[in-house]
Curated annotation (Swiss-Prot):
Function description: Catalyzes the rearrangement of 1-deoxy-D-xylulose 5-phosphate (DXP) to produce the thiazole phosphate moiety of thiamine. Sulfur is provided by the thiocarboxylate moiety of the carrier protein ThiS. In vitro, sulfur can be provided by H(2)S.
Family membership: Belongs to the ThiG family.
Catalytic activity reported: [ThiS sulfur-carrier protein]-C-terminal-Gly-aminoethanethioate + 2-iminoacetate + 1-deoxy-D-xylulose 5-phosphate = [ThiS sulfur-carrier protein]-C-terminal Gly-Gly + 2-[(2R,5Z)-2-carboxy-4-methylthiazol-5(2H)-ylidene]ethyl phosphate + 2 H2O + H(+)
Name used for this protein in its record: Thiazole synthase
Length: 277
């Protein structure tokens, strides 16, 4: 049975919903939980974003818990948000599989007993943080067989994106530019190819620095956007979260409305006939 997941206070926009697995979400903006100055700022920003899906690094959350520190797993109301555990910090497929299993247990303890989502990250490169395509494919294939709803973070590689779709991944999440860099849309052609060739949702993840960039990929036909650093590192994080929310909605509406045809000549909007001179 399909389940709908939305915030009670979500504005009733004329937006089609986003389906991932058997879950339906009203917001196409997903947000992260890292790099905020404090928990209060993070919670306020997540609220302002209007996001349904919030991703949490399982390794970081577990370390905070072991040290007795407060973290967003305790601070957020998970009856109103859908947690997307991620395998950030994993350098191999085997490590990612172990962390994914831990993540599934954690979300069940938070009350989301039907949550099998995992944002798969396999990143052996500590400098540029580019994901390992071979390790990602290997881990994804195993996790899909184990019943996970796999959402892999990948480079902007159309061939890999299609392979991940073919083995049963629920989405693909190609980067726009290096994670946390704010460099913006450096792979537009490849992103466009991935979007055009995909039969599953394409969520643009990493590198987006401004709302205009989020709107641009949504106009291209992306299914959604995941933003963390651009919000968390903004001087006014809650305000930037709201701006990203509006940009994603605007971009999606633009895509579904359709762009006007570009003309090579001018075309006046006011009539030039029938007016006395």
């Amino acid at each position: 049975m399909k389940q709908s997941f939305s915030r009670p206070h979500f504005e009733n926009q004329e937006l089609d919903s986003l389906k991932i697995g058997e879950k339906i979400f009203n917001s196409r903006l997903m947000v992260g939980t890292g790099k905020y100055n404090n928990l209060k700022e993070a919670i306020k920003s997540i609220d302002y974003s209007g996001a349904n899906i919030v991703t949490v690094a399982i390794r970081r959350a577990q370390n905070s818990k072991n040290l007795g520190r407060s973290n967003l797993l305790d601070g957020l109301d998970w009856s109103k948000l859908w947690i997307l555990p991620n395998t950030a910090g994993c350098e191999s497929a085997e490590e990612a599989v172990r962390i994914a299993a831990l993540g599934r247990e954690i979300v069940k303890k938070l009350g989301q007993t039907d949550n099998n989502f995992i944002k798969l990250e396999v990143i052996p490169d500590s400098h540029y943080l580019f994901p390992d395509p071979i390790g990602t494919l290997k881990a994804a294939e195993y996790l899909v067989k184990k019943g996970f709803i796999v959402m892999p973070y990948i480079g902007a590689d159309p061939v890999l994106a299609k392979q991940l779709e073919n083995i049963g991944c629920a989405t693909v999440m190609p980067l726009a530019s290096p994670i946390g860099s704010g460099q913006g849309l450096k792979n537009l052609l490849n992103l466009k190819i991935i979007i055009e060739n995909s039969n599953i949702p394409v969520i643009i993840d990493a590198g987006i620095g401004t709302p205009s960039e989020a709107a641009k990929v949504m106009e291209m036909g992306a299914s959604g956007v995941l933003v963390n650093t651009a919000i968390a590192r903004a001087p006014n994080s809650p305000q930037m979260a709201k701006a990203m929310s509006l940009a994603v909605k605007s971009g999606r509406l633009t895509h579904t409305a359709g762009r006007m045809i570009i003309n090579q000549t001018a075309n006046p909007s006011s009539p030039i006939f029938g007016i006395s001179k």
